[in-house]
Amino acid sequence: MKCGVRGSDTVEERAVPQGNVPGERYSPTQPFSVDMPSIGNQTLKESDMWGATAFDQLMCRIAFKGLRHEGVYTPPGLDPALQFPGSLGGMNWGSVSVDPTNSYMFVNDMRLGLANYMIPRDKIAAGASGIEMGVVPQTGTPFGAMRQRFLSAVGIPCQAPPFGTMSAIDLKTKKLMWQVPVGTVKDTGPMGIRMGLPIPIGMPTLGASLSTQSGLLFFAGTQDFYLRAFDSGNGNEIWKARLPVGSQSGPMTVSDPR
């Protein structure tokens, strides 16, 4: 990293859950960065289940109790399991941005779970495409897979918000400086209905951020249609502008050769 400091100095191998798929080989450990903050990959509990109403919260609690969830690195198996974060990514969709002057790193994350299980080859229905959610054929392997986003009956994540945040890490101290939810339900909502409300609950984020030497952090990868600027020192939103559609990529700058 070209800011005069290192990222994680210590990587530790830790024991992780083992799967139950016949013929599969599982690593007994996985690497963990032990001296850097952990962002958005907590082990979920039944009490973390949430809903827009008491009904869908109850349905999420019932669904959670029917899933095997052993925290990060929960492997798929023959029984339904919950991976959190899911395959859409945690803090790795849009990568990070770095302020090399102050040695700050900025990370946006996506907190969406994925429920899945493996299906023996002879039990996969003909015509499965693997497009979007549902059955993934995994042709040429002994098993296919069923995958579904861990959402409530009205189409919102089952765990309590925030569903996406922006975080700042001081690379000199390796401490979390600040973390704020990003994104509102203005352009989305239950059952795909736009709520039009600027409630900052923190939505799943896509794209990446852009940090500048002037102390600004730009970001547009939220579920509402805004380009935002944050104070990189404290995470306060200091400006935003409406976009015609949502953004799934990172902002960029240009330099005037004059």
Predicted regions span which residues?
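Noncatalytic, solvent-exposed loop/strand surfaces
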Residues: 1-258
